[in-house]
Amino acid sequence: MARKRTLGGKAPQAGNKVSHSQRKTRRQWMPNIQTKALWSITLGQSVKVTISTSALRSVDNAGGLDNYLLKILPSELTPSMRRVARQIRERKAAA
C-alpha cells in the first residue's frame, strides 16, 4: 500500500536508529495508513479514502465524514477530497 494519504496530513518521518553502542543509522517511521470507505450522509454514498488512524478518530469525533470535511481548511485536503467537500457544501446549501 502506498504511504500517501487523502486525509490526515501524515507523512513518513526520518531520523536515526540508535544502538546501545550509540551507532546511528538512518531510518523512517511510517504513518499508520488505512484504506477505508467512509459513508457520507449528505451525498448518500460511501467515499473511499486513504486515511491515517489518528485522522479516522478525528472523523469519528467530528460526527462523521461530512462534518469533518466542512470543519477543516480546504488547503489541508487533497484535490479529490476538496471535490467531495465542495459537493457536500453544494448539497447542504441546496437543502
Curated annotation (Swiss-Prot):
Question: Region entry Disordered: which residue ranges?
Answer: 1-28
Q: Which UniProt keywords apply?
A: Ribonucleoprotein, Ribosomal protein
Which domain of life, per UniProt?
Bacteria
Q: What GO molecular function terms would the record report?
A: structural constituent of ribosome
The Gene Ontology biological process annotation of the record reads: translation
Naming one, the record's GO cellular component terms include: ribonucleoprotein complex
Q: What Pfam family is a match, any one?
A: Ribosomal_L28
Record's keyword annotation contains Ribonucleoprotein: yes
Family statement drawn from the similarity comment of this UniProt entry: Belongs to the bacterial ribosomal protein bL28 family.
What NCBIfam families does the entry give? L28
- Name assigned to this protein: Large ribosomal subunit protein bL28
Q: What is the lineage of its organism?
A: Bacteria, Pseudomonadati, Pseudomonadota, Alphaproteobacteria, Magnetococcales
This chain is encoded by the gene named rpmB
